[in-house]
Amino acid sequence: MKKNRLCELLGIEYPVIQAPMNWITWAELAAAVSNAGGLGVIGPNAGERTETKDVVETGERLRRQIKKAKSLTKKPFGANLMTSFLDHPGGGEAFSRRCFEVILEEGIPVVVIAGSGPEKYVKQLKDAGIKVLHRGMPVNVAAAKEAEQAGIDAFVAVGFDGGGHTGHDRIPTFVLIPQIVDAVRIPVVAGGGIVDGRGMAAVMALGAEGVYMGTRFIATTECPAHQAVKQAILEATDTSTVTVTGPNGVLGALKTPLMLRCVQMEGSGSTSQEISNFYRPRYMKGMLEGNIAEGTFVCGACAGLIKKVKSAAEVVRDVVKEAEQILTRL
């Protein structure tokens, strides 16, 4: 696959980005993706099994993972910077600010800013030589234009098909991507429902210059998600996922008893914060402990397309190879 603007920008071989996911995208996974030629990204609470309300400890947790990634790869990798912790138990700007400071101190190659208001961090990050991607929330044309004006290097557009929080607008990937591509000059990275080369070829035909995959990387050997989560993804069908509304947007997840209860809550008029208060404390119980009855199993609608646990390197290689074959054939 020929290198494009995104590859040149990030210094990577293939335009494949592993999406940062809460608790389960630690240094080992990020480094494996980067070593395979993509871009691995450390997520919030990476490598941890307990939550903290301490601002300083939050920063040090991130620092430990960055140092670990540096020991595992010499290739570019990234870290996630949340601009808002709307449902964080400690709340507030202080957590974002401390993670931002640690990122500057450690001098990593790439940052993926998630949330609204990225402009407050962009200049200092870029002045430090860090490439800045924005995973918009909200994710729409207006947000992409604002990100471009703020100096963001590339915009990550995740459609409603994705897992985790995808904003409130509920725009499907194949409607979202071409509209954003038409609206901005910076590279657009597509996410939401992409697990293989077919999806990669499709969004690149729509004008995207890279893919942003989360759910596919859950079902990898390097991901610390519980085996029950990976097995549930392998057994998923086209009707195995569900969405509910939280304060950070729509959440995509497997249709577990807990998530069905959230659907009932939403239908009966519960607020997004009340729903979040119900599912959020159960992330670890689901993703790390594998408790199907009581846990939250976050993933995208694409889960039904995944049939095998692979290494991160296999995922990168197979996605790129299949996309190349399809694009050559068209």
Language-model regions, residue ranges each:
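Conserved active-site-proximal phosphate/metal-binding subdomains
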Residues: G167-V189, V195-L330
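Active-site entrance/lid segments in N-terminal catalytic domains of soluble metabolic enzymes
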Residues: M1-A183
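Residue-level detector of alpha-helix initiation sites
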Residues: I24, I194-V195
